[in-house]
Amino acid sequence: MDFISENTISDKTTLEELKNATLFQVTKVDDRDCLRARRICNAPKGHWAGLMEKAKAMGDPTEEEKDELKKIVESYNTVSVLGVSKSEGATGPRLVSSLKGLKNLLPGVNPKTLQETLLVGAPCPSTEPTTEEYWNVCRAAVGASMGSAKINMSQKVVMGASVIGWGQLNQSGPGVYFLNTKEIVTAEGKVDETRGPLERTSAPLMRDISRLIQETIEEVETGGDPSFSVRSEGGSKIEGRIAFSLHSEVSTLKMRIALEQKLAKYEYMGENLLTLVKNTSIDRMQPDSAMMGKMVLESLRTHTVSSEQLNGRMITVQSQGLETIAISSPFDVEYDDGYVFTRMKGNFVAVGRDYKGAILCFREGQGTFFSGRGNWSGLMEKCLVEMRLCPCFYSCTWQDYPDKKSLYEKATFEAKQIVFAMGENTGVDIRVNTDGEIGDKGISLLTREREDKYMSKVSYECRVVSGKLVMGLDKMSRVAKGNLEVVREKGDDTSQSDSFYEGVLQVGSMIGTTMESLKQQLQGPVGIWRASGVSAMERCMKRGQSKTVVASARYTFQKMMEKMATGREVSKYSLIIVMRCCIGFTSEANKRALTNISGTGYYISVAQPTVVKLAGEWLITPVGRSKTGEVQYVSAKLKKGMTTGKLELIKKADRSDLDNFPEPSADELLREGTIVLMQIGKDKWLCRVRTGDRRVRTDTDIQRAEAKSQVEKEDLMDEYGV
């Protein structure tokens, strides 16, 4: 097959000498113009290897050698390199290939006959090696096509076509070019027909889709009631591009319907364009106009990304609801274009602000991207929602919030109210960098009155579904009403800054439970929650001084308890600092981090994310081990914080149950399967005792062992007549 090896490229290589046959393979290309290709083609089995050396060695060519050189020049006409885009390693080069077509290689045969011959898979009508080899490639491409695409493919290879190929991203070795003909061209001579994935399409198709989207936007925006239009973000332009988003459900729906009608009118390679876009998973798409169309069809918000909005200082919070993803277009090496979409999936995201005031977001492993324009109030609203510090997260019911979308809409509304109560111009520095350092003044939250209104709506009732207690707001248990929550473990290898904000999230989800437990133990007020900055614990965290961290947490907790005992103000972040130790920033959290705090009249297990006080027992839901519908408990006879069993809630006890079932004391051993009464909140519940973690000897195990020993002793006594 015809090709030029990368070893034959020199400074004197001309454009004509870069011409290639239809099969080629490429590697990553650095910045260069079209006359200097350091790496273009390398087909191991091609018979034109070392072409330049061969031509130089001819000297004064004979007539036969002149004929051979003429064939070489003619073979170049099959592919023309018209231009190579500047690349910084993110995208490969851009090659425009002009396929000559079989009709030019077989001028004596009718093109229609050639097309029919290809469709039936017949051999090449010519015995010339180059023509025969190219025929086999074309026949393979036609054979791999499906349905009506076979006819389109056969017509293309017979009549010739112009295609554009793009290199793979971040290539470190040999790569392939993906053509907009859906062909995968490799050096081995294989041409496969891809089905469906739009990531293997080219710029012309993307431009067509982009044009159709833009036409749809203009039609929707200029027609109908203004409330039904797709509005631009403040009408602003970012580097010549209008940043638009789909605001309301009405306009989103109208835009989706209009785009469906528009795409349904066009076909690509014999396949309906609407079907092609819809049938491609958004996770498999390149971030181009096809992805943008997919997002519009799925009513996902879109934004335009500018190069100035791709840098900034970040803070990290954990999102348990909607996941925001964005990436720049691979066809734009200047990184001034891209798309953002949001979907329901938990992940770490970071929020920051650039020097021009744009709020930025970062998704772990995906780099930085633009989320929206606004001020610190908007950023604070996002943080309140992301960290689930809004009242609705503590008082949710299935009837009020049937899905997470409605829940997060309510949380966003409450976050706006909270920030409004704070005031937009508080002058508080809440900038946080990637090391987890917060500005000197910390985050100012609420006054006592506002705190009572927005942050204390904690219900103490747990809902039972199918005979089990339902806790939390994760996807397995959205029907909960109460303050118990199953928190899934993220793993030990967590960065320090991520760990702190994961701690913020978990503490935020259990503040009501913790403070209620403290109130019961201390028999006094808990004081006012407010933020007064971050102690030395967070400042030393990045240096890994574990002893200092633990000592600081102990001291902070001691001072916090002293203030609470007298009803004085207590920093909310003081509680976070203490409970932060339950997350741990090393893989040896139990050895290096504070696991429990105990004293006269109170006990807090910071080794567990949720601790609640029931009748003489500490009921805990440990990270990573609890299942939905279960409350694990510990016994006062065993070490504090050790999981020994589970209580399965059956139903709320009625009058007859109060007389028929026992209410165990804190030190009583419970047999597995026993049904007992437990005080949960204001009501008593019938609970069935289950064994806990198999790695721990449970109360049931202890009692079974004691019973077995007693039975064996009695049997021996009977055997010997004692």
From Swiss-Prot:
The keyword Iron does not apply. The keyword Chaperone does not apply. It comes from the Viruses. Keywords: Host nucleus, Virion. It is found in: Virion; Host nucleus. Its main location: virion. GO terms for cellular component: host cell nucleus; virion component. The RNA polymerase is composed of three subunits: PB1, PB2 and PA. Involved in transcription initiation and cap-stealing mechanism, in which cellular capped pre-mRNA are used to generate primers for viral transcription. Binds the cap of the target pre-RNA which is subsequently cleaved by PB1. May play a role in genome replication. This is Polymerase basic protein 2. It comes from Infectious salmon anemia virus (isolate Atlantic salmon/Norway/810/9/99) (ISAV). The lineage of its organism: Viruses, Riboviria, Orthornavirae, Negarnaviricota, Polyploviricotina.
